[in-house]
Amino acid sequence: MEDFVRQCFNPMIVELAEKTMKEYGENPKIETNKFAAICTHMEVCFMYSDFHFINERGESIIVEPGDSNALLKHRFEIIEGRDRNVAWTVVNSICNTTGVGKPKFLPDLYDYKEDRFIEIGVTRREVHVYYLEKANKIKSEETHIHIFSFTGEEMATKADYTLDEESRARIKTRLFTIRQEMASRGLWDSFRQSERGEETIEERFEITGTMRRLADQSLPPNFSSLENFRAYVDGFEPNGYIEGKLSQMSREVNARIEPFLKTTPRPLRLPCGPPCFQRSKFLLMDALKLNIEDPSHEGEGIPLYDAVRCMKTFFGWKEPTIVKPHEKGINSNYLLAWKQVLAEIQDIEDEKKIPRIKNMKKTSPLKWALGENMAPEKVDFDDCKDVSDLKQYDSDEPEFRSLASWIQNEFNKACELTDSSWLELDEIGEDVAPIEHIASMRRNYFTAEVSHCRATEYIMKGVYINTALLNASCAAMDDFQLIPMISKCRTKEGRRKTNLYGFIIKGRSHLRNDTDVVNFVSMEFSLTDPRLEPHKWEKYCILEIGDMVLRTAIGQVARPMFLYVRTNGTSKIKMKWGMEMRRCLLQSLQQIESMIEAESSVKEKDMTKEFFENKSETWPIGESPKGVEEGSIGKVCRTLLAKSVFNCLYASPQLEGFSAESRKLLLIVQALRDNLEPGTFDLGGLYESIEECLINDPWVLLNASWFNSFLTHALR
């Protein structure tokens, strides 16, 4: 078919058709029937226009080739075959100069004699069927429709055929010749049938008996039969319907649906202001672990015992000093709180038997840090409803923050591999059914790709901290309990390892409602010098507490060890979700599964093994200012997991709003990329609802920045 097209049609038409297909992401070498159809349609449009001019008296005349036509105006403006943006510019210009209503879809021609747009159709089916489809789609009085078939039939709006008999005969003869040429090469049948490419499997089935009766009973009101309903659905064009419904609602509502073009969307406006700060409940890439390998001490597995053993592995403690104060806090209290923790751990070690839990003495620095007695007294509303000046607290508007580079670094780090495994392969019984075998295989491949990922470490750390904090909040409501921040993993050699990140001290926790807040002070070890990115640590008071000797390629190096201290808070509902962070593994596995399913349905066999074992193939991971980033399937697994984990770590109303609203714009852009000619109304309102979520949250700002990169590259 491709050879036939290149021989049969003018090279200029072939070139235009190739350009059009490439603009829509289609390949002329693969979709050869479509290639032929586009060339045929373009040739008919050009033949429709050929030799037709308007003379100085405004009359339509035909000028044969060779006759002088230099001073005459072309009767038809050809819109078909132009670049999409140029075509809309031409249409807009015609509408502005002639006053003709703007069409919703790009027409093929404009007739300066009759002052109307023309939609040309070339069909391999019945002309009246194709005419109805076109009319249903366009739903416009302004656009005139003219349909030709390969059998010599034609149909036009109000039987007004625009051109003289001879011009139309020339087009019909050319179409008949194309058909004969195709038939002689054995191409016609395939070409004729390919126009019904929209038919679905069920249309080929004859629905009879009970199923037919059920189908007829299930129809919406006002439809007499299944065929009747199908015809309506096939011809349904939602944009015009929505416009009509809106105009019925109120005279004030005037939602003109505008075509959404490549030039329509603008980037999201990110807020200006000081850089955003770290707001996760625990340190991520900056965390430092004190660890013990192959723990076998007495009481192994009891958090306090494990913590004491980990603390004993470090010998570089020194007198703590404040290196980065908290702007608004009483920093000396944070310093004293750490000293108290050290002293009380020393007391534990001095005891003959280590207690299972440790409640801190309620010293004034700890009371201050945990907000003890800071909450205003609650008074029953009935006791104060007569107070004349009763009002809600004045609360400040949130301060706008700008995107800072640290959050992208955090995300990149979360996608990386560590040298430890954070997931135990849970034992599930023998597979019984074939589908179970496929599911197990997928789970095992996926687990192998993500078990060493840093995002998986964050999951296990989050699950541990939230579980311990919720337990303590319920079991010791009035106590300032000391909770070690612990995780467990396996080394490359398979040895068990217990890690200590730092400590949490829980405040009073009489949590009646899901949203009641428990305050806690977190104290976390780190080797990151806070003075490198002070804006990231706005909420922290940071102490220097020791020197750690590290082995490097050039020998041993001493690095200062810091303690990141801050007051924080959480609620029962947040801790409940934190305990269920393992769900992130399931979510990302399901996303990978849908990719495997898509590949398998194309190849008509299960592609799990090939999908994971073909190391040479790369997959799209995400957008960056450089373009579409690609990587191995393992990198895709880890990136999807990291996104899911960050959605959990940085969960907020801003993220909820941004995700819901930006998804609408994303779907519109996807529709444009899929050549579905989307229309929109109140696009400004959609942008407003997205941008009102861009305030100060680092993860939301990063997602907005990624969204802008996507817009740039998706609409090239």
Curated annotation (Swiss-Prot):
A motif (Nuclear localization signal 2 (NLS2)) lies at residues 184-247. Mn(2+) 2 binds at residues 80, 108. Mn(2+) 1 binds at residues 41, 108, 119-120. GO terms for cellular component: host cell cytoplasm; host cell nucleus. InterPro entries: INFV_PA, PA/PA-X, PA/PA-X_sf. Its EC number is 3.1.-.-. The keyword Protease does not apply. Influenza RNA polymerase is composed of three subunits: PB1, PB2 and PA. Interacts (via C-terminus) with PB1 (via N-terminus). HAMAP family: INFV_PA (MF_04063). Belongs to the influenza viruses PA family. This is Polymerase acidic protein. It comes from Influenza A virus (strain A/Swine/Wisconsin/1/1961 H1N1). The gene is PA.
